[in-house]
């Protein structure tokens, strides 16, 4: 960092969190920050426990992961320390600050009532509050503190998955509802885009002549936003981000229908791209014209992936229950292969052979059929109807997952935390993507993942590798009534299990949700996506639209409802 940049940062932080907080409160914030960091680091290390068979490899990967985290942590500590004037009064106070007093204050105060929402329940469960005297602050002060910390984190010129996990812990510890953080994220994203648009519209010659003068003001702007908010100043708050990192942070603003070739790095010269068709991102906000309006941009990105198709609308339709809190995209990939699979599955479940065979399957249970290859002869005779489309989709999903991973590594989403949701072969694609991120030692990019009806193994090693690259929630959704998935997977390595029909065990912090009561067949996932996300108490879903989805295009099921 140059001396000029250091001078800018020092000037910027003269009017930051130190304005909002008293010296004692600044000590509390610094202490809380360090405890949250230690908590997140411990969560990361849980993915690499002592029971791993290959301890040398596990230790090596753990070192990669924690090295990335520690570098991010150092940046955060530096920024927070500068914002609260750490080198002056706080440095002395931290050593003698009574930790037991923090706990006692937390027990004695009356917390602000949480919003009675499912998302807040998950916030408390997944990111339990850390005792701190800061939760005794007046409500408006806590609101300013949370917003100020969000803006301080953005001074890193990125908003990583770890940054968001940190803010989730902070929100919980300040005893604020999740909606407060989400509203802050939306407001900041819109202001950044608005400011960037205004800048890009100014005269180029004027920009060049003024660049040296305004660059310094811009860098001060966001750094001082917390103090500026207190003082009622509204201009130039997004300045340093706009000046240095708006392109990288909000890189996904041009995601739209971008195809793979223009956004890949290491794979650009490989043959994998040529083997995958129709790889593009489609905005869920404006699916007709794919225009992303200024007000639709967010600090977080969600990519939703369908796993089979009946019509091309199935690329987008299952996902309309995703809310406005994130910038949502559907991945268009291998339309022809997925449509072929969808048609084949529909043909199978309507066939006489399937209707007769499923009774026998049910009587034996899925697991015994898999373990002993006890599939009805009539069903095996028509297996070729499904086996070829299944094999093609399996192969293409694995390749498309590698491409998605490369796109993520090359920041197609910008420097923003990413959520991935997929069912059937969409889940297989995510599996391949996460494995690739793991193999390439890319951590801190993915915030949360939901995989539904996954044609992927349930073995511990595979899920530990995925767990290590997902900073937040990793969810396996399965149904023991998914007989089609069981039948399709019979030629694969069934000794490793099937995640789509059973829970994942012996892996820390992998959530399992059984949906056998509402998913009575593989074709059902598309119809009840919103209901499943609601069962998960997923953040950022549109509850008003979920009831409508339940009546959407009801398809044939593997098994008739009881």
Description of each model-found segment:
Residues 242-314, 318-319:
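Membrane-engaging insertion elements
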Residues 31, 60, 71, 75, ...:
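Acidic, Ser/Thr-rich intrinsically disordered and amphipathic helical segments
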